[in-house]
């Protein structure tokens, strides 16, 4: 059983389990937490359907913070000067490198910001003072943090990583995919995917990272359409509801560790095939590149979320309905 709280319309939808059987008598009382807290005096008007109970709530909408929380920010990782953070391969736990200083990149697309900045300044003069076009050069001790990746100095990973097909970065010990190429980065920096590594033995599920990336890009570019890609496969997604508190009786996300229900999610409409209205001239779809392993995990989460709804709520036209859990710092 799954319940969703539609914040802006003041309604809770309680979806019955797709395997629920119709028994014409009361066999038990079931306590189920709703994804919001109400006083006992709040009027509730239930609308009962074959597979859904709609609760119309006569109270002001509950407000939620619009802050986008991103896994592993600099403030979370920086420690005393004498203590370094250890980075390991998530799959085989092999040591990759250690970092003593972390800095946040200013934007999901920081190179575009630099290009814009260079167009509005005395470029040759500034470059001669700074020694080059990039202000974000990782060192052996300092790494930079993006929304979904860690920018590391390539030389500090010597002997620990190797380039595979399509210039993807792989672990030299277990061949797990660690990073994705990006020709906008500095020549001595490589991107390690946050979902492919452990930092101080902490790991982050790919769905949290992709959810943060979707919300960040949505906020920055006012777009709602994204393509999650691993180089060969694609998931076409619409960010339908950016903030959806849900409660569940049995978690549809068996591969992720959650705090107690309710949790905060993004409600997505998604397809594994190219949408029928897509044309090559469409420029409002934004790519979110992920590793092959992360793609499999995200596909699994979306499918499990979809199957937790009754059949009548699993699709919206040709689109499937899915959920991605949002990250909160209390999770690590």
Curated annotation (Swiss-Prot):
Coiled-coil segments: none
Gene Ontology CC: cytosol; nucleus; ubiquitin ligase complex
BP-aspect Gene Ontology terms: co-transcriptional mRNA 3'-end processing, cleavage and polyadenylation pathway; proteasome-mediated ubiquitin-dependent protein catabolic process; protein autoubiquitination; protein monoubiquitination; protein polyubiquitination
MF terms in GO: cyclin binding; ubiquitin conjugating enzyme binding; ubiquitin protein ligase activity
Disulfide bonds: none
Superkingdom of origin organism: Eukaryota
Pfam families to which the protein is assigned, alphabetical: HECT_2
InterPro entries in UniProt: UBQ-conj_enz_E2-bd_prot (IPR019193)
UniProt protein name: Uncharacterized protein C1734.10c
UniProt organism field: Schizosaccharomyces pombe (strain 972 / ATCC 24843) (Fission yeast)
